[in-house]
């Protein structure tokens, strides 16, 4: 399932990262190349454990010192990161968000979620649920909420 949800600045599109089919559908809807990769977000630090397990304790503590918040970490991708998430990169972007919609969705799914702006590539991102619906119709499940956080 593909979700549309408000974030700190724009509306986002996301899904479970282990669903290659949904990730490809997001890229198709956005007219975005798969090789660009996607960020993984969650409201719960423990959801990142599988993606940080290969890092030193010092680096893990450094991520904890900046999270939750707007800081995005680019870390070397380990074997837990599917190729359709990292794209052509050897790294994966991770962020622990404080936005209520991301916290709620990641808790409901008990997982990180992929995140990318809700827009057609190279076009301005959606700023509200109506714009998301106009862009993607019934292809996405739109969560309630407001931008900011």
Regions found by a protein language model. Name each.
Residues 1-149:
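Active-site-adjacent structural elements in enzyme catalytic cores
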């Amino acid at each position: 399932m593909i979700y549309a949800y408000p974030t700190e600045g724009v509306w986002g599109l996301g899904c479970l990262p282990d669903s290659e089919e949904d990730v490809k559908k997001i890229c198709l809807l956005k007219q975005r190349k798969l090789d660009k990769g996607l960020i993984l977000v969650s409201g719960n630090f423990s959801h990142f454990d599988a993606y940080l397990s290969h890092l030193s304790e010092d680096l893990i503590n450094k991520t904890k010192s900046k999270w939750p918040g707007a800081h995005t970490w680019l870390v070397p991708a380990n074997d837990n990161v599917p190729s359709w998430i990292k794209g052509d990169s050897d790294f994966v972007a991770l962020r622990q968000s404080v936005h209520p919609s991301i916290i709620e969705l990641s808790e409901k799914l008990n997982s990180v979620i992929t995140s990318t702006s809700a827009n057609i590539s190279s076009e301005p991102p959606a700023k509200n649920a109506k714009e998301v619906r106009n862009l993607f119709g019934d292809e996405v499940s739109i969560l309630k909420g407001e931008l900011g956080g």
